[in-house]
């Protein structure tokens, strides 16, 4: 396979590697090509420095992945905490916790909350993939943490890849001080920091971005993350068709209703045909949960890219028209025109201005939308609801399509009481080191043994699955 190496952030070149090629071997190839000592090279990928003993497969490097290699002398601080503080001291047995790459982070617990503590953002499937990756290429995990809309060449929802770059030099040479734990860490600027490894760059600000995971991408290829779309790890039936599909979209209502992407597409098109999208002053043109739950408008409007190019263009047009109407304007009623106009308040005679080739020149009545006339309007009809295509949801299906109900069942199966205060605590992946969230307790204990955390637990089964 081929990986692309960017050396000192200046230029890139391809390097042929195997899945079992070590990072040190990759350094040796680059060092020979560049005429520099291999021990001065540092390999940066997805927000962390890759250690010499790791292999290409262990690091989740895929065909035509881009890695950054910088020439920088080793420092004493690097020996203990080279990758941003995620690596603890060696255990008595010598086991070392490698800092977790962005390729293994899962933020769905932020959108799909549970009562977890500790490393709640790492799902059980992610922990399994750690051990599976070491067994060979045939065990490569199929679980996808992120989904994006790829505008090209895919033109559809695809698994995504989370990446990070330095906010100063805009190179992907920044190692994170700690990994993101929620979507806000990724989507809100200036929340996360690290250390840029590029020579002469003092940058510490992390900037996250996403790429389509279905095809090789260049440095500049980015895609928008769809944070409501997730793997249907709990096998929740779709609220509309009641089938168990994957992936699914989870609305941000209290019940976290689940809908498959095909039914979400139909829901959007139906509401679009009826012009029943909601115009929100802050969010824009959006839709609530299909069950009509309050306070559930979709905030990330790129989810409507699922409509496809033609319908999405119509969505944008209707959104712009709705904005004009909200401002007190009118739309030209002549077929094929529909220009947005802002006549004076109380002005009955409206002319679709023909300036700049935007208007058609049609003169119409503001009240009845017919050709302009003197006197009373002959007839006025309510446009809304005349041809409404009702999109109804079965109440029983709505009750079964709740992500939170499945979450409660999961919690029952995955919780253990704190050994000191008996408060139930859920383990949602990650290590065996638990901490009671109760302020009066805060006991650190071992999930495996059920006793207070000690050095024996640390050395014996800290990271057992």
From Swiss-Prot:
There is a cross-link at residues 349, 369 (Glycyl lysine isopeptide (Lys-Gly) (interchain with G-Cter in ISG15)). It comes from Rattus norvegicus. Keywords: Autophagy, Cell projection, Cytoplasm, Endoplasmic reticulum, Isopeptide bond, Membrane, Metal-binding, Mitochondrion, Mitochondrion outer membrane, Nucleus, Phosphoprotein, Repeat, Synapse, Transcription, Transcription regulation, Transferase, Ubl conjugation, Ubl conjugation pathway, Zinc, Zinc-finger. It catalyses: [E2 ubiquitin-conjugating enzyme]-S-ubiquitinyl-L-cysteine + [acceptor protein]-L-lysine = [E2 ubiquitin-conjugating enzyme]-L-cysteine + [acceptor protein]-N(6)-ubiquitinyl-L-lysine. A zinc finger (IBR-type) spans 313-377. This is E3 ubiquitin-protein ligase parkin. Zn(2+) 5 binds at residues 418, 421, 436, 441. The active site is at residue 431. CDD domains: BRcat_RBR_parkin, Rcat_RBR_parkin, RING-HC_RBR_parkin, RING0_parkin, Ubl_parkin.
């Amino acid at each position: 396979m081929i990986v692309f190496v960017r050396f000192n952030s200046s230029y890139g070149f391809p390097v042929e590697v195997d899945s079992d090629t070590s990072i040190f071997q990759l350094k040796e190839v680059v060092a020979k090509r560049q005429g520099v000592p291999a021990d001065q090279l540092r390999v940066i990928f997805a927000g962390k420095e890759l250690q010499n003993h790791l292999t290409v497969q262990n690091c989740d490097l895929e065909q035509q992945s881009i890695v950054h290699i910088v020439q920088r002398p080793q420092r004493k601080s690097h020996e203990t905490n080279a990758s941003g503080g995620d690596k603890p001291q060696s255990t008595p047995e010598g086991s070392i916790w490698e800092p977790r790459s962005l390729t293994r982070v899962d933020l769905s617990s932020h959108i799909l909350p549970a009562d977890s503590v500790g490393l709640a953002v790492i799902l059980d499937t992610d922990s399994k993939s750690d051990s599976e990756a070491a067994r060979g290429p045939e065990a490569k995990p199929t679980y996808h943490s992120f989904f994006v809309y790829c505008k090209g060449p895919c033109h559809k929802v695809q698994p995504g890849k989370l990446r990070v770059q330095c906010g100063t030099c805009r190179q992907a040479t920044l190692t994170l001080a700690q990994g993101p734990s929620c979507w806000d860490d990724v989507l809100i600027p200036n929340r996360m920091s690290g250390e840029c490894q590029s020579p002469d760059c003092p940058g510490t600000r992390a900037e996250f971005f996403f790429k389509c995971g279905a095809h090789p991408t260049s440095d500049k290829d980015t895609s928008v993350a769809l944070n409501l779309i997730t793997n249907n790890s709990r096998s929740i039936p779709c609220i509309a068709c009641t089938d168990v599909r994957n992936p699914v979209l989870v609305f941000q209502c209290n019940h976290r209703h689940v809908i498959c992407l095909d039914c979400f597409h139909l829901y959007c098109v139906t509401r679009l045909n009826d012009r029943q999208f909601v115009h929100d002053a802050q969010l824009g043109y959006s839709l609530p949960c299909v069950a009509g739950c309050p306070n559930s408008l979709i905030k990330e409007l790129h989810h409507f890219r699922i409509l496809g190019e033609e319908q999405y263009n119509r969505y944008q047009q209707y959104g712009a028209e709705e904005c004009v109407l909200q401002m007190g304007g009118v739309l030209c009623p002549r077929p094929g025109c529909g220009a947005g106009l802002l006549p004076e308040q109380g002005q009955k005679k409206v002319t679709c201005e023909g300036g700049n080739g935007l208007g058609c020149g049609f003169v119409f009545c503001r009240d009845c939308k017919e050709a302009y006339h003197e006197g009373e309007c002959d007839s006025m009809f309510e446009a809304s609801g005349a041809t409404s295509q009702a999109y109804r949801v079965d109440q029983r299906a709505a009750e079964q399509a709740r992500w939170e109900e499945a979450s409660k069942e999961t919690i029952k199966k995955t919780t253990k009481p704190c050994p000191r205060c008996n408060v139930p605590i859920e383990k949602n992946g990650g290590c065996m080191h638990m901490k009671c969230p109760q302020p009066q307790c805060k006991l650190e204990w071992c999930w495996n043994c059920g006793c207070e955390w000690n050095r024996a637990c640390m050395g014996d089964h800290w990271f057992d699955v």
